[in-house]
Amino acid sequence: DIKGEYTGLTSRAMSAPDGKVRIPLNEEAGGNGQIEEYLMAYNGEGIQHIAFSCDDLPACYDRLKAQGLEFMTAPPATYYEMLSERLPGHGEPVEELKSRGILLDGSTEENDPRLLLQIFSQNMVGPIFFEFIQRKRDEGFGEGNFSALFESIERDQLRRGVLQPGKETVASK
């Protein structure tokens, strides 16, 4: 379950036995959040995003950006400042990730990094956006990044006036 300052959602994931097809199912935990906005804007349920795997995410980002693909706004600098605390010994070049807005998730227990790098495009086909991921022995869904992305979407909703500080939502009750 993911809870932002104003809204929340419940997420469950299904994976094929070979791991090549993964389907997360998300449900709004209260009104006025990103799922409610999606349902209202597109008249019901649908596909939110499609993920593509790549072997070198920074190089993939550079190629896609050069071809004109627009990406979601990067998380604040504090996200990258906190990476060493959240994933000690991860070994990734933080400035390279930060300059591209690439998110990092996984675990580094027992000095054995299992990492997931990910980035998201702007909406590309109606409401659908693309996710680009690089797996370094991590088979998760970027649960730690899910919270960071959720918070960045919530900030965008505040900026657009969909959410308003001080107004109670179902998730904040």
Where are these regions (language model features)?
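Glyoxalase I/VOC metalloenzyme domain signal
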Residues: 3-173
